[in-house]
């Protein structure tokens, strides 16, 4: 620092020679200025450095807090992305499960419908057979009542069977 000041002041000494003219007190003024500037710098340097350092620390603190917020937001973003991926996997498994359940339910409904149809057909066949037997029984009973009601008609067994077969058939 002293060398810089000396180099700065050296040209003043070189040009400050007297020419036999008016005596200017440039050297004294320059020395007074340098001395004043040096004292001023001595007293103000530490507060200026402290002020500058506090500003640097303040900016560094803000930068650190911003970086911390950025890290936290990145963590939240990563967590949200993980949850989205889990939700996608969960949704696809739910869709697959729903499809399987729908297929199983459709098969069960089809099987139940087939069983119900078979039961209805069996019931219809049984009812039809019952009605045929009932009708046959009524016809035979009617014929027999007609035959036994009339005394004049004497029929042997073969004729009776033929008559019944004609009525039924």
From Swiss-Prot:
A single GO molecular function term of this UniProt record: proton-transporting ATP synthase activity, rotational mechanism
Pfam hit, one: ATP-synt_B
TM spans (from-to): 3-23
Keyword GTP-binding: no
Annotated localization: Cell inner membrane
Domain of life of the source: Bacteria
Coiled coil: none
Predominant subcellular localization, coarse grouping: membrane
ATP-binding in keyword set: no
CDD domains referenced in this protein's UniProt entry, alphabetically: ATP-synt_Fo_b
Keywords, alphabetical: ATP synthesis, Cell inner membrane, Cell membrane, CF(0), Hydrogen ion transport, Ion transport, Membrane, Transmembrane, Transmembrane helix, Transport
Topology class, membrane: Single-pass membrane protein
Quaternary structure and interacting proteins, as annotated: F-type ATPases have 2 components, F(1) - the catalytic core - and F(0) - the membrane proton channel. F(1) has five subunits: alpha(3), beta(3), gamma(1), delta(1), epsilon(1). F(0) has three main subunits: a(1), b(2) and c(10-14). The alpha and beta chains form an alternating ring which encloses part of the gamma chain. F(1) is attached to F(0) by a central stalk formed by the gamma and epsilon chains, while a peripheral stalk is formed by the delta and b chains.
Family as reported in the entry's similarity comment: Belongs to the ATPase B chain family.
Protein's name according to its UniProt entry: ATP synthase subunit b
Species for this entry: Campylobacter curvus (strain 525.92)
């Amino acid at each position: 620092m002293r060398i810089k000041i000396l180099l700065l002041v050296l040209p003043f000494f070189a040009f400050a020679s007297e020419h036999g003219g008016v005596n200017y007190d440039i050297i004294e003024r320059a020395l007074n200025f340098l001395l004043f500037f040096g004292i001023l710098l001595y007293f103000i340097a530490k507060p200026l450095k402290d002020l500058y350092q506090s500003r640097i620390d303040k900016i560094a603190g803000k930068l650190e807090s911003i970086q911390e917020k950025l890290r936290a937001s990145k963590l939240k973003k990563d967590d949200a992305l993980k949850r989205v991926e889990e939700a996608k996997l969960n949704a696809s498994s739910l869709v697959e499960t729903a499809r399987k359940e729908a297929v199983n339910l459709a098969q069960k409904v089809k099987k139940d419908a087939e069983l119900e149809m078979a039961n209805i057909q069996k019931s219809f066949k049984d009812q039809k057979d019952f009605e045929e037997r009932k009708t046959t029984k009524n016809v035979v009973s009617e014929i027999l009542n007609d035959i036994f009601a009339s005394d004049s008609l004497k029929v042997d067994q073969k004729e009776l069977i033929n008559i019944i077969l004609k009525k039924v058939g």
